[in-house]
Amino acid sequence: MKVSRRSSDVAIFVTLGLFNVFRPFVLALGVGSCIASGVHRRTLCYPLRIAMKVAIQGELGSFSHEASGNMLPAATVVPCARSAEVFDRVEGGSVQAAVIPIENSLAGSVAEHFDLLLTREVFVHREFYLRIRHNLIAIPGVKLNAIRQVFSHPVALDQCRKFFRSHPRIRAVPFYDTAGSVRHIVAERLHDAAAIAPKQAAGQYGGRVLLAEIEDDQQNYTRFLLISKSKKIGKGANKTSIGFVLKNVPGVLFKALSVFALRDINLSKIESRPLRGHPWEYVFFVDILRGDDEASRNALRHLEEIAEFVKILGVYPAAQAL
């Protein structure tokens, strides 16, 4: 892929084959394209005349930043301090899309993001599984034997227990963000401290990787979602995310799941969360391995007859974790 920048525009030039890969996501986001030629006689050129901005929660150099680079490599990343700000920017139109973590294979779901998907006017267009690699990062010149404290997000610290057991003199210090912890130790010139963060954070803030991939479990993945205001469904969509609330009557969950089973629709995920503002009531989140076809539409119509509330959170291509 060749990327050229002119003034405030981002022009992405891709071969026909690559464009066909990205086309469903680009068009689903509501970004227009035009066809030109001349890069090569056998190559079509598709310049996307838009300053594509993508919001993430957290700092530059974070795992969300890394995931956004895989999903929309030419976009300008807009870091946000809070998850609600990410959704505010998407709804307000100051960014065209956002990349959010939704669940980790070890730590589980990001509850706040499920709640925001349910209540905000956004739509899921793509998912991506990022292999999580935790690295010990310090300022240049600092040796491992000088480290007495390590900063990072609590989840990252918890996923590196073996490192702390093998280095009992090093204290784990919870911090608001993995990449933010690198920025902190570099800015403060802390010679007795390090951070646990993605490798990208070291390059972003001028740190140095002391130890690479210190996570306990190498089968550590985070699932990220690409969201926008547009509800256009791109080609190749074969997965649907749904949120629904059921009436409190006997057998209702069985009936709700039966609408999928009766149509041979497979569920890849089901989870319940407390329904905000309604103590002891719950919302169910379900992923089904079907796109916008007749079977799924009939299943959703059937579900609406049973449930008090149904919301389609997104229809998108299923990704592979491995």
Residue ranges and their predicted role:
Residues 4-8, 20, 33, 37:
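Serine residues within intrinsically disordered or low-complexity segments
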Residues 14-17, 37-38, 45:
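Serine/threonine-rich, low-complexity intrinsically disordered segments
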Residues 16, 27-33:
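Low-complexity, intrinsically disordered Ser/Thr/Pro- and acidic-rich segments
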Residues 28, 41-322:
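Domain-level signature for soluble enzymes in the chorismate/prephenate branch of the shikimate pathway
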